Amino acid sequence: MRKHLNDLYKQIEKFPKTSGCYKMYSKDNKILYIGKAKNLRSRVKNYFSKRTSHKTKILMNNVTNIEIITTNSEYEALLLECNLIKKYKPTYNIKLKDDKGYPMIRITCEKYPRIFKTRKIINDGSEYFGPYVNVKNLDLVLDLINKTFKTKKCKKKSKNPCLYFHMGQCLGVCYREDLEDEYRKEIEQIKHILNGNISKLLNDIEIKMKEVIMKENFEAAIKLKETKKSLIEISQTQIITKIDKLSEDYLYIHKTNSLNTIVILKYKDGKLTEKDIHFDESIYEEDELIEKFITQYYTSPNMIVPDKIHIFKKIDTSNITKLINELKNIKTEIIYKETQDNIKIIEMATSNAKLALITYNHEKNKAIENLKTILEMKKLPKTIEGFDIAHINGYKTVASLVTFKMGKPFKDGYRVYKINSLSNGEIDDCKAIKEVISRRYSKLINEQLKLPDLILIDGGKGQLNAAYSILKGLRIEEKIAICALAKKEEIIFLPNKNQGIKLQKRNSALQVLQNVRDEAHRRANNFNNKLHNNIKLNYTKIKGIGEQKAKKILKVLGTYKDILLLNEDEIATKMKINITMANKIKKFAEEQNLNNKQNNHI
């Protein structure tokens, strides 16, 4: 079995033993095959059997990833499979010519509604139930409904009662106009049954079965038994298809201590067509996370906003609804409703969120193992510390340290440093790297704290050698692995190796390193900007200096130390201000410089 198939097999071991659909992807992220299963783990495992056909083996040689969507029943899986195949038209699926769809039960919107089987949806106010995969079951249940309840079968009015009235299967609404209340009660009972409330009807069938068996009418007993089975199967709520001519999204968030999994189930023209998964590491509380995610997700430029956005808990959404509608120039609703259908859909979203988290963690673990192999490490890089340097034209140089554990950010391990070894205006990333590496690991050694498994430097060979020289000086180069990742080329550099390592963009090990590098870069820049902004805001404390002029002082004159190198005339000339204001700026810089005697480690 090829390596990629081994990796896939490990992924499948995490699949649940529940019903659902699976999508098989190629290396270029194209869907090759879509299938459904009663037991996802068991079904997908079958593709790895030695007894599979030649065509299946060709398929599996091209599959690099398998994504699944769990459902609440096998029926739902079958319907979802149908919808997905129609949407994506995968290479290895049969192209079906018959696209008439599955039948449904229609209750018309007439004064005296009729009930019948249909495959066509008419948006006239009629109510629909289904669709139903097993047509035989549907026919048996419709026959039971028609015999149990006195519903209208005729389309036209008549002066005389119809045949069904004489058979006791019609109230006589075809010739009478005074039966509206009584007829409405019949219809409500039928809807009650079609919504899954079948216990009373099942009890009636049991009684009838005993009666016909007593009379030795075994043929009738067999039919009643089949009807009972059909009623049970058909009562399973078919939530994959919602008979609404609109688009709806259902959002669910599964929170854990380290990660939030966000699932959006997308319905279009009444059909579940897509699942969108997002992972979030923010520290927002649940209500705030719902609000923040909806705002960012639905206001993004290319996002098509649905008619309705269903959420899984009640919160105030008036402001974000208004914001989305104004920005997108649409009219959408963000709603929370505890209907039976909505609860079922949220249950499905919950199941998919939990499964996505398992898959995500599995992929992270696989990436860490991959990274160990590529970097030729002796142990897994479970803890990675990443460093980056930031400055603005050599001023206020800072360093950042970020920590990742098993491929995920560990915020408690974040640090920022002010670099002391460089004077203002001096640009030397290697010297800055040496300082921060020395400060960080001298502290860990002195305090006998645990060392990371891997150090990542944002930069190239020069920055790597600078950091490695410090590790050698501390005599810990054998205890910690170290590498550098260059930005544009995305080349990995290792100590004592002339050639860098170039990985494919989709390589999971590279993605882990990129995440660490990008987070260190973000953290360093944020801290550097904060320091510059603090100086700018401090300048506004000078009487007569507003925010715009403070910004100009920082840009033209620089930091407090830079100002101390200038005399009042030079300040006045550079800033194009009078000597009095120049004196104020010089005096303020002297005061601030004296007050700035503080620890550089934040």
From Swiss-Prot:
Database matches in CDD domains: GIY-YIG_UvrC_Cho (cd10434)
Entry-linked Gene3D superfamilies: 5' to 3' exonuclease, C-terminal subdomain, GIY-YIG endonuclease, UvrC, RNAse H endonuclease domain
A GO BP annotation: SOS response
GO molecular function term, any single one: DNA binding
Keywords associated with the record: Cytoplasm, DNA damage, DNA excision, DNA repair, Excision nuclease, SOS response
GO cellular component: cytoplasm; excinuclease repair complex
Keyword Plastid annotated: no
Keyword Lipid biosynthesis assigned: no
SUPFAM superfamilies assigned: GIY-YIG endonuclease, RuvA domain 2-like
Highest taxon in the source lineage: Bacteria
Function: The UvrABC repair system catalyzes the recognition and processing of DNA lesions. UvrC both incises the 5' and 3' sides of the lesion. The N-terminal half is responsible for the 3' incision and the C-terminal half is responsible for the 5' incision.
Stored NCBIfam families: PRK14670.1 (NF011264), uvrC (TIGR00194)
UniProt record similarity statement: Belongs to the UvrC family.
HAMAP family, sorted: UvrC
Quaternary structure annotation from Swiss-Prot or TrEMBL: Interacts with UvrB in an incision complex.
Protein name: UvrABC system protein C
Source organism phylogeny: Bacteria, Pseudomonadati, Spirochaetota, Spirochaetia, Spirochaetales
